[in-house]
């Protein structure tokens, strides 16, 4: 998704941003800055999915959060700035939960391996179970699950390539990715049940909101959130079949 869809979005953005600034004279033409953010964002996403160390996962997580903040606020308009800060604090809230989970697990077992975290959690080691719960909470914010989905709607004010990158391509998938990585440790647990409930509720509510919209971008956003909710619920079940 990152390499193929992300690359296609970047190629599309070349022509789109040319036309965008041709028609939006009120927005400062800073395309080099825009594309720099896109490439940093994609690089951070690659680092996120390829990392086994929880420390590196946390680092790349925060890089994507900062990039999304800057991309949403690209136009420097009042609405864009307001929505960019909303996205920032919601994603940083998840980042705090992720960091606390990692630090707590590391302080207890002296390990920052995601694989080891899952292994320990499956055997019922308390620090690992708590770590999984906190990281799952962080993933729910990144995956735009209710009630954390408002930042995703606010991303609509950004130029289409960045909103597409944030919506349908990569950033929200980071939360889904980490939930699926944690799925073996969540099956049949309280954390898993909470994730299933949040995902199912998001799927149902976002589906209703999607069919009631008349704006194409909002239909895309709510339908994306709905499908993310379905994937979240499947990850929470934790069985091989649902994954």
Predicted features and spans:
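...captures the hydrophobic TM-helix bundle architecture rather than a specific catalytic motif
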Residues: 1-243
């Amino acid at each position: 998704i990152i390499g193929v869809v992300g690359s296609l979005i970047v190629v599309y953005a070349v022509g789109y941003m040319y036309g965008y600034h041709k028609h939006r004279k009120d927005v400062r033409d800073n395309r080099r800055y825009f594309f720099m953010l896109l490439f940093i964002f994609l690089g951070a996403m690659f680092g996120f999915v390829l990392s086994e160390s929880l420390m590196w996962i946390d680092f790349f997580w925060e890089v994507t959060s900062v990039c999304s903040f800057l991309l949403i606020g690209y136009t420097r308009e009042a609405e864009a700035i307001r929505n960019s800060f909303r996205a920032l604090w919601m994603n940083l809230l998840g980042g705090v939960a992720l960091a606390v989970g990692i630090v707590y697990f590391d302080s207890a077992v002296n390990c920052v391996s995601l694989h080891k975290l899952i292994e320990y959690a499956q055997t019922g080691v308390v620090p690992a179970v708590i770590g999984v719960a906190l990281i799952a909470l962080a993933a729910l914010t990144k995956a735009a699950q209710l009630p954390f989905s408002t930042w995703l709607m606010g991303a609509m004010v950004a130029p289409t390539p960045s909103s597409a990158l944030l919506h349908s391509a990569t950033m929200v998938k980071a939360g889904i990715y980490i939930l699926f990585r944690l799925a073996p440790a969540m099956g049949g647990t309280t954390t898993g049940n909470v994730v299933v409930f949040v995902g199912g509720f998001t799927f149902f509510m976002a589906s209703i909101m999607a069919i009631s919209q008349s704006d194409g971008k909002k239909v895309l956003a709510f339908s994306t959130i709905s499908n993310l909710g379905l994937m979240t619920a499947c990850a929470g079940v934790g069985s091989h079949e649902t994954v």
